[in-house]
Amino acid sequence: MTQSQQVSADPAPLRTPADYQAQLDEKRERLCGLFADFTLPALEVHASPAEHYRMRAEFRIWHDGDDLYHCMYAPATKEIIRVDQFPTASRLINQLMPVLLEGLRPHPVLRRKLFQIDYLSTQSGQICVSLLYHRKLESEWQQAAEALQADLRAKGFELQLIGRAHKQKICLGEEFVIERLTVQGRQLVYKQVENSFTQPNAAINEQMLGWALDVTKGSEGDLLELYCGNGNFSIALAQNFRKVLATEIAKPSVDSAQFNIAANGVDNLIILRMSAEEFTMAMRGEREFNRLKGVDLGAYQCNTIFVDPPRAGLDDATVKLVQDYDNILYISCNPETLQANMAVLGETHEIARFALFDQFPWTHHMEAGVYLKRKAG
């Protein structure tokens, strides 16, 4: 991104607590309206911090001669906006942003064809920074980047620095950070890997985990989770169940989940690297898988299933699979697809608990949670 393009200063909006409450009330009304055709319990609303809530941020880089700045595109106009501070992002990201640019400016080898910087921060104080380039990274870059990382660490940042280019990734330390979340008074440890999915709002993540624990309190039998990622939910929920089975297909996520199981001393959770479709075939005895050697599926009585699908929601086949379970815990990042899935799930199950999580304040997006129980008779 070059100086020939127009760049505007970031006009940070002045927002008050009343403004935050107003946007939260609008989401509450919209969510209740979306589910007006269902018999609903009282909606449980979980508010976010109004600023410094986002643990991840990505910025394009604008070059002006020997200088450079973070910038973003305005959603409506696509205008390039210079960003010196970003109140949406964590305080740690905001602290590092100017210091990192200060470290990059004197070094052409670090600046040249740098087009994006990604930040992954934690509440624990650790942060991972990825520098993305439109060129191959040579040994000269690595030497300069190692010096930059050492300088930033000397300034008090518990930082991991990564360089990325086409088909190239150079990790100068680790490619992950360790997050610590407090859930119902208990501290949970999570390995979060660069460039893989993690919950963006740590405060809301803690509230979602606490809510999931509360709604499944006193559960009988075992839990099945489909596509568990790094074990974010299954590790927290394991204390409420005799045993937990979780599936995940991405190897980096499975590796992180195994690390997190050990780090949290969980001894009743098994992660299976397989798809929901494969697991269904195995559970019904339709096919055998080498990956299940040593796992006795017959020893599990999964009365409860947990799903946290992408924005598209559950496909028709998975909805039918989920209906087989007495209790369904469903976290949705798109209540419209949750509503569509509920058109089917509502035939057999009723909504026992209903929650709104303000994962993305100041945006249209909402996160919703429902706990469904099989209808009597």
Curated annotation (Swiss-Prot):
Top-level taxonomic group: Bacteria
Keyword Membrane annotated: no
GO cellular component terms, semicolon-separated: cytosol
Stretches that traverse the bilayer: none
Residues binding S-adenosyl-L-methionine: 199, 227, 232, 248, 308
Active-site residue list: 333 (nucleophile), 367 (proton acceptor)
EC number assigned by the record: 2.1.1.-, 2.1.1.35
GO biological processes: tRNA methylation
Disulfide bonds: none
Keyword Iron-sulfur: no
Described purpose of this protein according to its UniProt entry: Dual-specificity methyltransferase that catalyzes the formation of 5-methyluridine at position 54 (m5U54) in all tRNAs, and that of position 341 (m5U341) in tmRNA (transfer-mRNA).
Name this protein carries in UniProt: tRNA/tmRNA (uracil-C(5))-methyltransferase
Organism: Aeromonas hydrophila subsp. hydrophila (strain ATCC 7966 / DSM 30187 / BCRC 13018 / CCUG 14551 / JCM 1027 / KCTC 2358 / NCIMB 9240 / NCTC 8049)
Gene that this polypeptide is encoded by: trmA
